[in-house]
Amino acid sequence: MTTSPEASVEARDLTRKFGDFTAVDSVSFAVRPGEIFGFLGPNGAGKTTTIRMLTSLLPPTSGAATVAGHDVATAGDRVRRSIGYMSQLFSLYLDLKVIENLELFAGLYDLPPERVRERTAWALETAGLDDRRETLTGTLPLGLKQRLALGCAALHQPAVLFLDEPTSGVDPRARRRFWDLIDRLAEGGTTVLVSTHYMEEAEYCHRLALMNRGRLIALDRPAALREGFPGTILDVRVEGDPARAVAALENVEAASDVGMYGRALHVRVEAPDAGRRAVVDRLTREGLGVVSAEPVPASLEDVFVALVRQEGGAAEG
């Protein structure tokens, strides 16, 4: 496979089948050096399978991909030496101290002694763990384990860093701190590919690949995806049960997508004025007092829901 000279990662028609089931279906994209590139989609969309192929842990059924200039199918060893990888399980040894985990990974990466001191000091400082270097890893809060795992994955200064749903189960404040670290790595030139199902995290990516049922259904900057949203979103608030309001709008022709958004409803309409009248009329007839029904900018969640509907529904699992 000939790689574009400006691409750190490139996939062309990348496909993976398990028997008759197609987990990843002809996915193509290219990622630039220093870019934070996100995979967004529900469980079962193909995000993890794509990352496993790109890290040469799983051979493609067809198609091709290169990472840091190396073919994932024919140069797996070189690919693995060029990357860092962090999964949602973190892969830390809980019975080791923080510094011992870092030194262990430094040994796995075959770093020379002088580099071990330099890079472990960097990881401790970057993760905010200087004062916990002698702490048993298993006693750390989840957010600190997460930052330690990122430090281990980036210890050898890989050209490309793969993060597979790394913030699952972590509170929003810890997630924001984690993304600050990702930004620092990207600013230093590391290419970062990250999968997530958190919409707010997806906003931090430079570009997003939206995946559903193994297919790439959209690829662009988060702002561009929102700006290209088809139609208008109404933010609807009712006095009664929002779930009842969702059910009441199911057969309203003017309301093509209806979903809960906190205590509000987000309703997609093609014509804002006519759509608003149709929504308010139906809710009023159903005895649900309408507090407000106003147009708002589309969120990434709105974009994703609309695209999935066009593709015939979400992946299962």
How does the language model describe each region?
Residues 63-71, 79:
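Conserved ABC transporter NBD signature motif
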Residues 103, 107, 114-132:
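Conserved ABC ATPase "signature" region
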Residues 150:
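Hydrophobic anchor residue at the start of the ABC signature
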Residues 157:
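Conserved catalytic motifs of ABC-family nucleotide-binding domains
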Residues 161-164:
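Catalytic Walker B motif of ABC-type/P-loop ATPase nucleotide-binding domains
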Residues 180-194, 199-270, 297:
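ABC transporter nucleotide-binding domain
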